[in-house]
């Protein structure tokens, strides 16, 4: 029996018991690094949206989105406990490390999921709550349980889950979905493949050991490198769309263009990387830059908004 077929067996033998997990262990179950990116992009969507929202309601909205993202992470770790135990990158996560039992993680994730969606609906609006519920479902069921272990396109399709937060933040203010919020979605959606395939290149051994069909393992390094360049180009183009569509300034557009060129440059370095190169430094550099890129793009959008709607409205001169 393979690890994938046996994922339910992890930690399920013997008499049911409770773990002695600490608050820190449960916090790690929420994938705080991923949550920080989710919270930041959701906050950007909330701020950039036209209209006003009560600061307290806005805080509740961001908190609910953060809790929903954490719930998704907990459910992902519950389902993936079998492969997490084998992969070097994930072996120290709370479940494979024996700090939290799988059934505890499942209950924790389901409880937080329901709480975040219900409170967001009651306190903000039900469209935002529905989008949050769909995001959790998409990440846990569509990506984690289905796509991740069945197709090398897992990241391409599954990346939608990570792209919804700014759209949810936008819906919290406006109660709707617009072209602008779809553009914010697309920036993250198109960014995701290059980001994760860079990781998959230098973690091929881990993914191969557990049978997860990542692009490099199934289609080879050469195909993966070409696909990374394609998605880097698409990401760079999506990054300047806010200016092209008129909801960001030329200053932002110039900054996004420079960032996009950097993304493309790093992707081309990966393309030129010899297959015999076991260190894969270009892939590691692209992975690191891609994280900085996304934070920089959404930070620039926020700064651009503040200049246009706060400082200039107050009588500043640019």
Swiss-Prot record:
Q: Where in the cell is it found?
A: Cell inner membrane
Q: How does it sit in the membrane?
A: Multi-pass membrane protein
Q: What catalytic activity does the UniProt entry give for this protein?
A: heme b + (2E,6E)-farnesyl diphosphate + H2O = Fe(II)-heme o + diphosphate
Residue ranges that the Swiss-Prot or TrEMBL entry lists as coiled coil: none
Pathway membership of this protein? Porphyrin-containing compound metabolism; heme O biosynthesis; heme O from protoheme: step 1/1
Keyword Transmembrane part of the UniProt annotation: yes
Q: What else does UniProt say about it?
A: Carbon 2 of the heme B porphyrin ring is defined according to the Fischer nomenclature.
Q: Describe the task this protein carries out.
A: Converts heme B (protoheme IX) to heme O by substitution of the vinyl group on carbon 2 of heme B porphyrin ring with a hydroxyethyl farnesyl side group.
Question: This protein is called what?
Answer: Protoheme IX farnesyltransferase
Report the gene name. ctaB
